[in-house]
Amino acid sequence: MGSEHSSEETQTCAKELATNINSNHSGILIDTIVSSILKVFQLGYNLMPSFSSSDNRETMALQNIQARIRMVLAYLIAQLGLAASQRNGGLLVLGTANVDESLVGYLTKYDCSSADINPIGSVSKIDLRKFLEMIYVKKEWGGLRTIIDSIPTAELRPLVDGKVAQTDEAEIGLTYEELSVIGRLRKPGGMGPYAMFVKLCQLWSDKYTVEEIEEKVRKFWWRYRVNRHKATVSTPAIHAENYSPDDHRNDHRPFLYPDLSYQFDRIREKVEEIKKEK
């Protein structure tokens, strides 16, 4: 589900990886959908948002609409994809938000992070890279190598001379290596802002000044605080690590149930029993 902001490299990586894992792959451009929605908005509010606007609300809205369209399309494809090829059944939508993105809210509410289940939702970006490295060593998939070496980017802003101008780490203000350390101090370390700052002064004493560490702690906790509302609609993730954003004590939102055939059989027996008594 590419757009005019998608780089050639990303599109090539997607195709190559699909070939490597023997998966069906199709390319769909969302630009016409984005334009149609924006025109409807313009009719009602007499405003056409632009990336060149000095109002950050416009640039954020333009990015968010792309992300949310991808969520809608993903569910449509999951529901009708097999029907289009004359096959029975339906598909599940998989989420793509990792631990670091979830903790700092670097995702759009109800975007492509919204899904039926998130297989990487409890794993950090650094550990995901390590996992991909392990797979690459075993399989030597060319598309995977390019993905591992690529700079993380949402690709929701216009390209500059055909190249990506937007990067995750620049927008977050923290590197994924830093987020991996901070995330573990939060959980399972159980540290709040002050305890985290004190600990990082020890861990990063040879890398940053205390003022720089203070700024990084402030950035993380500010993002964590203002974006925590997004966690209320986060897609259930597989519990793979102890630093997951989820509560591991129990699942407050159970959604995997047995078929209840035993209970239904007992109900049917009770119905027959009651009928006989009458």
Regions found by a protein language model. Give the residues of each.
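ATP/NTP-dependent adenylation/nucleotidyl-transfer catalytic domains that generate, transfer
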Residues: 1-278
